[in-house]
């Protein structure tokens, strides 16, 4: 064994060994308990970032630990390879998305291997290959036949100059990111999957997910947004149709003073025929971004349509306005407004001078003060005719019942959740397998024409999708009849909704899933990824699992038992102000800093001499140029050091502050472990440990070893507090470094301790542990070694610490044998000088003794 720890030499050797031995490849084995550990698959952007490294290190630690417990552990990896960034990169680099993507996959695969992650590479998949997306296409056609897929028009962001659809992130300040043209909202036909048919199950089954974070479950509950309310129909004077609205607050209905409809509503369109102001407003609404978050913060605007609706209970005429905060695709495209008791309605009414009628009393029973804002709390009704004096629940039921009896109301359960629009007007995605025949019939692509393959050898112009630009691509024939293929592609959330299941049978050619393999491995035991995926990906992931279950492919209700959302990785951020007043962000690697005595940054400059402004720690990002390249760190310190720092610096679900000083600390610790093993093995063979012949000091050290095993096992296995597990191993190492190594039993005990330390560190730092295990054992492979088990007998304390008080004040702490009697404890306490001086010349009136813990002598 060489004296110096040289990670650059040992890590590549160990990685080669894993590759050659196929150490982490697994197959179904009914004789073993399975464990499926999965990290969210990466988008092949070109390089790994520290967020990836943190996510995958957590997964690898858990997988390696479970493997050492003797379980059959599946830990696969793949590539979420379709998506918009590849199109932009292809245009920029004058290539096609496919070669750019495959090059990135090859590069990032090497980076993953360099970090020593124990993946089953035989199951690697890329979602952009026909071998993968063919089954998604087939499944979509089956959902269509079941009535779970339909086509309808829906609003998109449209660039009139480029004649193309834009994703929300391609709209910057209301303009096209490419040509700066004002973006419009346009209705185009799109494909939808009926996720709303599963809304109740998606909501109720959240209660089964005991090991998912409450924050994620709450976000999903709110997103699904189940509400109970009443659908109310209004007659409209001089208009052929009625207006229908939905409300969750029928108790406030007597305070409804106007209705609002979407700009695209037929009533608004009709009114605009003779109203130029309204027509201009409808035109303006076409330029409103579709994203719901934008809707919430934008200025609320509207125009009176001139139509009057009739309040069903009071008979009063109330105005109907067109408003930009009402969307056609949400509900009926019309809402009732109660400005006295809804803040948005209040602001709109105040702006346009509309009537505000209070109908709920304040908490103290007085009339509410509506001079500044609406009263949104529930309460007792007034100003509401026959319903006066009713509380919220009674009023809800009474008004709902009356509207129902009159035939103008109906109790309804509503969902905020909308059906999943899966059409994208992009090129780099899986083609949607639908065709339109010459006679206009729309039908799924027949099985014998699947997969519908996306051509990869294309030229990108950055505007139109190559499969839309090439009229020949869409042409096909079905049963001898000419037909046109759909040129939209799937939302890339489709691919990431079922990849976890395909990992169980990636080579299977008879269908989407091999049920036998899928049911052996599924559900996933732990799924690791960022909380930013809480509602989109993680909801579609759950939905797809239920679709596959109902197709008979899997027999579980939920895809993952446990979800672990890792925290973000933060780093220092610095900038200087350029000549034009713009911020130039400088990488923390290039910042020369001065710190105060507490280690805080007080001054910074870069190599060019710019005075830098330090903005504190923020999420590693391209925009702030504060990302740290994992590859540079691995080359400098080794993969094991980077992994150890990632797991030690912070609890897994909290933010992690990148500090190179902390990385250096992790590296020093591994050098200490190496040095101790080197010094131990240099002394030659070790005798067997004779537990019965140990001295008190040796027993105490052995007790520490086994207590550490117990703590680390609990911290990794049950609590998943990996940082405290590492801290416990470090503490033990400090004790081992000071332990005597001269005697035969000293060395035998050190051998037992080091074998335990190396196994406990193995999930975190597998390369160094692989090497040290071979040095300590002389044979075998740590990847097949079992996790150390704490010896209960070794942990039994021979002695205990007793606190000695005189008149309730602590005067000493004494060590006594565990089986000492009260008399023996009193005698031992009396020998303590600090106790004896308080007993001198006084009488002990009372003795309070808590065995093994406390002795209180009451004197007077």
Swiss-Prot record:
Membership in a protein family: Belongs to the class-I aminoacyl-tRNA synthetase family.
GO biological process entries: leucyl-tRNA aminoacylation
Position of sequence motif 'KMSKS' region: 619-623
Molecular function in Gene Ontology: aminoacyl-tRNA deacylase activity; ATP binding; leucine-tRNA ligase activity
Localization of this protein: Cytoplasm
InterPro entries, alphabetized: aa-tRNA-synth_I_CS, aa-tRNA-synth_Ia, Leu-tRNA-ligase, Leu_tRNA-synth_edit, M/V/L/I-tRNA-synth_anticd-bd, Methionyl/Leucyl_tRNA_Synth, Rossmann-like_a/b/a_fold, tRNAsynth_Ia_anticodon-bd
PANTHER family in UniProt: LEUCINE--TRNA LIGASE, MITOCHONDRIAL (PTHR43740:SF2), LEUCYL-TRNA SYNTHETASE (PTHR43740)
Gene3D superfamilies attached to this UniProt entry: 2.20.28.290, 3.10.20.590, HUPs, Isoleucyl-tRNA Synthetase, Domain 1
Positions of ATP binding: 622
Domain of life, per lineage: Bacteria
Annotated coiled-coil segments of the chain: none
Residues spanned by motif 'HIGH' region: 42-52
Protein name stated in the entry: Leucine--tRNA ligase
Catalytic activity: tRNA(Leu) + L-leucine + ATP = L-leucyl-tRNA(Leu) + AMP + diphosphate
Enzyme class label: ligase
